[in-house]
Regions:
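Early extracytoplasmic/lumenal segment of secretory-pathway proteins
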Residues: 32-98, 221
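A structural signal for short loop-to-beta-strand junctions that line the ligand-binding cleft
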Residues: 84-89, 107-146, 161, 170-174
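A ligand-binding cleft/hinge motif common to bilobed small-molecule-binding domains
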Residues: 95-99, 225, 230-248
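Ligand-binding "clamshell"
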Residues: 100-108, 127-129, 241-253
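A bilobed periplasmic-binding-protein/Venus flytrap-type ligand-binding module shared by bacterial periplasmic
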Residues: 143-148, 259-273, 291-292
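Periplasmic-binding protein-like
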Residues: 202-207, 245-270
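Mature extracytoplasmic/periplasmic domains
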Residues: 267, 272-275, 280-333
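C-terminal non-catalytic accessory extensions
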Residues: 364-452
Length: 452
């Protein structure tokens, strides 16, 4: 009898274990089919709206949002590719998608939605090879807090070069391109519009007026909205969404701006490729495009018909002559020197902000005195100081050399982060060059002041 009971108990245990295993497999399969994992650099104000609306339209589906900076998202997808659990990569910077495409980390997808033109401005909305899709357009420009500007007597800027003026000293904020894909596009836009040498000179003259280089891209609109600083160099939706939220903010596109699509792509070997495609279709649908006009989002739709529902004064890249004449952005050039440009910005600006700002302040003060008391020798010293700040440790030809650009593989999040090998050697030489020039520029400007 005891043997029979024991036998039945073992049989029952085996059946229970088998049932649990089958249940686990079933639940796992259900989770794979009904969970969509998205790596994105976009802020919660945007992702929350799309998550809620997509889940509402697809009951039982869960969107898992993994928030990462663009460069960190690229790194994550590369490092997890052998056991990929990500379905979609969703970010602004098209050159980031080119990096993933070149590493065979994106899957092709054919969009079914109609009504999306081939181009916005001069730039293709979708990747011509089919690996990623544009869902919104983006331009780059300047936002400012009107209340702050009135209190500090700051004029309204109309061009990048306006931010070089002494009146803006310590009133400007920007993120670093190594920390933000959209900021990288802004820097590249200026470099491509003005040329390598003149573009960096513009960038450094503006940076000399920075109050802050923020750790994250959204730190710039936060700083402007809160009045921590008055002016921010941003992607357009930061300025437009701040307006939508009721902040006293204005935004303009300078004449030298680029108009490029913000994108989404299916990751190669996505666990839920079918649902990933459905999310792309949702973004490009009438409903998805209208969501871009939400006051907390305020991005430029890629479907021209959506602008009929846009608020008054909302930019329209399909009929705004200023935006249609935007710079033809060279994506291949940007991608080829992506890490190099980021490293150069950090060495010359991010990590030497105090040195650059001190030299800039000395020049501003000397020029103010020179305006009152003209002096040829003092003017010569001031011009020499300006030239020293503008000097670059690398030529455009070197920057565009693919072998040299390939040296830059590691991104430094902060000055204390260590790089090794050839990249470390090059950055150390750059740093020595930059510090010497900034210090000498400050010294010459102070000498000029002594003559006035």
């Amino acid at each position: 009898m005891k043997k029979s009971i024991a036998h039945q108990s073992k049989k029952l245990l085996a059946l229970t274990t088998l049932a649990a295993a089958i249940s686990g497999i079933t639940q796992g399969a259900y989770a794979a089919d009904d969970k969509l994992v998205i790596v994105t650099s976009f802020p919660k104000d945007l992702t929350k709206v799309f998550k809620e609306e997509f889940e509402k339209a697809n009951p039982g589906v869960e969107l898992e949002i993994l928030k990462k900076k663009t460069s960190a998202g690229i790194k994550y997808i590369k490092e997890t590719s052998s056991n990929n659990k990500t379905d979609l990569f969703w970010a602004s910077a098209p050159d980031a998608f080119e990096v993933l495409k070149d590493d065979n980390l994106l899957a092709k997808y054919d969009v079914k939605v109609n009504g999306i033109p081939a181009k916005v401005g001069s730039f293709p909305i979708h990747d011509p090879e089919g690996y990623y899709k544009g869902f919104a357009a983006a331009g780059y420009g300047i936002m400012w807090n009107t209340r702050y500007a009135k209190a500090k007597k700051l004029p309204s800027p109309t061009n990048w070069s306006d931010l070089e003026k002494p009146v803006y000293f310590k009133h400007v904020g920007m993120s670093a391109p190594s920390r933000s894909g959209t900021t990288h596009l802004t820097v590249e836009t200026i470099l491509q519009a003005d040329g390598w040498d003149a573009g960096w000179a513009t960038m450094k003259r503006m940076a000399g007026n920075f109050k802050s280089v923020t750790e994250r891209s959204f730190g710039v609109p936060d700083g402007v909205n809160s009045g921590n600083f008055g002016v921010g160099i941003v992607i357009d939706f930061f300025g437009l969404s701040s307006q939508g939220a009721g902040f006293p903010v204005e935004f303009i596109y300078p004449p030298a701006t680029a108009l490029v699509p913000a994108n989404i792509g299916i990751v190669n070997n996505a666990p839920n490729q079918k649902m990933a495609g459905e999310f792309i279709e949702f973004l490009l649908s009438d409903k998805g495009q209208e969501l871009l006009l939400h006051p907390k989002i305020r991005r430029l739709p890629v479907n021209p018909a959506t602008y009929a529902k846009a608020p008054e004064g909302f930019p329209n890249p399909f009929n705004d002559s200023d935006l249609q004449s935007a710079l033809h952005f060279d994506l291949k050039l940007s991608k080829s020197r992506y890490n190099l440009v980021n490293s150069l910005f950090d060495v010359m600006i991010t990590y030497r902000m105090d040195d650059l700002r001190d030299a800039t302040k000395a020049i501003h003060e000397a020029e103010a005195e020179l305006a009152k008391s003209p002096n040829a020798e003092a003017e010569k010293l001031i011009n020499e100081a300006k030239a020293l700040i503008a000097k670059l440790p690398i030529s455009e030809a070197e920057a565009n050399n693919p072998d040299f650009a390939a040296i830059f593989t590691k991104k430094r999040k902060k000055a204390t982060d260590k790089v090794t090998g050839r990249q470390a050697e090059v950055e150390a030489k750059w740093d020595e060059f930059v510090v010497a020039n900034y210090n000498k520029a400050e010294e010459l400007a102070e000498k000029a002041q002594d003559l006035l």
